């Protein structure tokens, strides 16, 4: 019995040794493969492949190979920023995005990366600054204007939020979320007429797309606004501030 156990233990150790050797060869193969590639864009693709499998450290090593040859290759810095952000290493991600923008001030993807990081840290003014920079070259991008409007809303600059939501629906009249948000913006501005107009648009678009949630929100907003329209400032204050009637 002891002899059988010793034999089994020997084979187990042998299998573990062979597995370790196999893994080591794989790692060496990966390193040699990246060292044989000279095209920086191909190396970045290889790094992205590593990133998708969660091998962040290997991906960063590959990108560092690119930067050893050309430290001013902005796409490599940008990709490092993406990897570090996904890895939840914000400090390193911030440094990488900033480096990409420093090298190429019109690198919009890197600026959007910075804005994403600032949003996660609730640094809305800094995020807004990056979105506005991107908007200089992407004037007709509804997605960018939507993000700008959101930042202004968070900063409680309501007129500016309205301005950019309006720009969104000018570019894309069927942008349902922008119309929904405009209801809240006009409600905040006590511009009941405009709010009612947006409710009509939202109900039309939501019926067209069978979006029951948007329809429900619009109907609830309609009830709320109708209840507020004919109230005096004194009435509104009495109903919205304690002690409540």
Model-based region annotation:
Residues 69, 103, 137-138, 171, ...:
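Structural marker of alpha-solenoid helical repeat scaffolds
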Residues 33, 39-41, 74-75, 108-109, ...:
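Helix-start (N-cap) detector for alpha-helical repeat units in TPR-like alpha-solenoids
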Residues 36-72, 82-86:
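Alpha-helical segment of the N-proximal tetratricopeptide repeat
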Residues 52-62, 86-99, 120-133, 155-167, ...:
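Structural signature of tandem alpha-helical TPR/SEL1-like repeats
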Residues 21-32, 188, 192, 196-245:
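Terminal, low-structured helical/coil segments at or just beyond the last alpha-helical repeat
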